[in-house]
């Protein structure tokens, strides 16, 4: 996916040249940033983007208080995401979107268990603290800590047991989540206009 943004950079609170440099420095050709659309109803759409191209830098800011700029961006996943939806306990989840959502469990580390819509039941022994269990198919229940580091010891207890779960959008799916577990679901869209 690619697109462009046309913006007005203003000198509110700081010199225009400083504001413009700060705006441009926020973009990278190699390090993805988040482009976020906030709707009037409070919902959001996000996409990770990198800089594809930008207008040439102005030769002078003298006497200017506002300047138009255009940024061209690219995304390599082809997916917009909605805001995180959280669930606890025994719940029926219906997720909007065009594609299966991203799902993970936030686990506070206590001994507990859960049952997925596929019927798979998993018991968790007491763990080392708050962890996230990736429920996406192919991630095989990868366990990470709050900093995103893989917890290989805890993950090894799930290997061969948990291969992941795929939910289809707009279908009802029942989860049984034990104490200390929170399901985090992120809808995926092909367009931000959903």
Locate each region found by the language model:
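Compositionally biased, low-complexity regions
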Residues: 2-34
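Short acidic, glycine-rich loop/turn motifs
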Residues: 9, 37-43, 116-118, 177-179
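Generic marker of residues within folded, mature protein domains
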Residues: 25, 61-63, 95
């Amino acid at each position: 996916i690619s697109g462009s943004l046309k913006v007005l950079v203003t000198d509110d609170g700081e010199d225009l040249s400083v504001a413009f440099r700060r705006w441009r420095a926020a973009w990278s050709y190699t390090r993805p940033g988040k482009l976020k659309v906030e709707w009037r109803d409070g919902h959001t759409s996000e996409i990770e983007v990198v800089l594809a191209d930008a207008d040439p830098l102005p030769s002078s800011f003298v006497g200017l208080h506002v300047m138009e700029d255009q940024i061209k961006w690219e995304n390599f996943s082809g997916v917009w995401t909605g805001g995180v939806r959280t669930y606890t306990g025994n719940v029926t989840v219906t997720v909007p979107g065009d594609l299966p959502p991203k799902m993970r469990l936030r686990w506070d580390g206590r001994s507990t268990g859960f049952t997925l819509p596929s019927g798979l039941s998993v018991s968790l022994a007491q763990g080392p603290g708050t962890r996230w269990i990736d429920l996406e198919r192919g991630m095989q229940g990868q366990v990470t800590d709050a900093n995103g580091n893989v917890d290989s010891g805890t993950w090894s207890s799930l290997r061969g047991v948990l291969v992941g779960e795929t939910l289809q959008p707009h279908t009802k799916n029942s989860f049984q989540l034990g104490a200390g577990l929170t399901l985090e679901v992120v809808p995926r869209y092909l367009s931000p206009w959903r």
